[in-house]
């Protein structure tokens, strides 16, 4: 179950914060939308509506969740850059995944993710090293998160859900 739920392992912030690591993460955020498109472009509606694990979200819900989550992330970055350690607003991710738009075609979210990531990457590439020390406070987790750590966490998040989809495709021999 753990390998199905966390195919790339749990997230943990890096100890040694480097410019090179940050640049690699930003490059990954730039590439992720194309990877989601490539891995889902041949899936049927029945395949998109298959949960990646028992009790887990469907591929369709995962795609819409990434759109929702990364929109929130982008706004959290902007808040942290313009306010002093803002308290961000958590949201009910599981509840969002059950709303009617999570059953919509993924063709609504894939271009959105692509556009959002282009804006996000533009923001990230324009930030200074000092900007990445800005932070926000997550009240549900009771943690202050630097934008450096948040960048790594959202790269993990992107790769985590991409792995849910690619592992499901492999297990079911859909390719």
Swiss-Prot record:
Keywords annotated in UniProt: Cytoplasm, Hydrolase, Metal-binding, Zinc
GO cellular component: cytoplasm
Lineage: superkingdom: Bacteria
Textual note on the cofactor: Binds 1 zinc ion per subunit.
Alphabetized GO MF terms: hydrolase activity; zinc ion binding
Cofactor(s) needed by this chain: Zn(2+)
SUPFAM superfamilies: DinB/YfiT-like putative metalloenzymes (SSF109854)
Gene3D superfamilies the UniProt entry points to: dinb family like domain
Disulfide linkage: none
EC number: 3.-.-.-
Localization per record: Cytoplasm
Membrane-crossing residue ranges in chain numbering: none
A Pfam family hit: DinB_2
Binding, Zn(2+): 65, 157, 161
Key word tRNA processing present: no
Known function: Possible metal-dependent hydrolase.
Family the entry assigns: Belongs to the metal hydrolase YfiT family.
Subunit structure, interactors included: Homodimer.
Name of protein: Putative metal-dependent hydrolase BPUM_0784
């Amino acid at each position: 179950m753990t390998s199905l739920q966390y195919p790339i392992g749990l997230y943990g912030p890096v100890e040694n914060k480097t410019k090179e690591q940050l640049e690699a993460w930003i490059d990954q955020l730039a590439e992720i939308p194309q990877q989601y498109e490539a891995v889902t472009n041949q899936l049927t509606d029945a395949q998109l509506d298959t949960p990646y694990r028992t009790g887990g979200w469907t591929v369709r819900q995962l795609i819409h969740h990434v759109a929702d989550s990364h929109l929130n992330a982008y706004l959290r970055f902007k808040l942290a850059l313009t306010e002093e350690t803002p308290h961000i607003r958590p949201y009910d991710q599981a509840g969002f995944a059950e709303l009617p738009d999570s059953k919509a075609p993924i063709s609504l979210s894939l271009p959105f993710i692509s556009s959002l990531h282009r804006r996000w990457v533009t923001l990230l590439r324009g930030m200074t090293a000092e900007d990445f020390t800005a932070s926000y406070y997550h009240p549900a987790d009771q943690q202050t998160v630097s934008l450096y750590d948040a960048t790594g966490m959202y790269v993990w998040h992107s790769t985590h859900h991409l792995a849910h989809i690619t592992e499901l495709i492999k297990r079911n021999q859909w390719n």
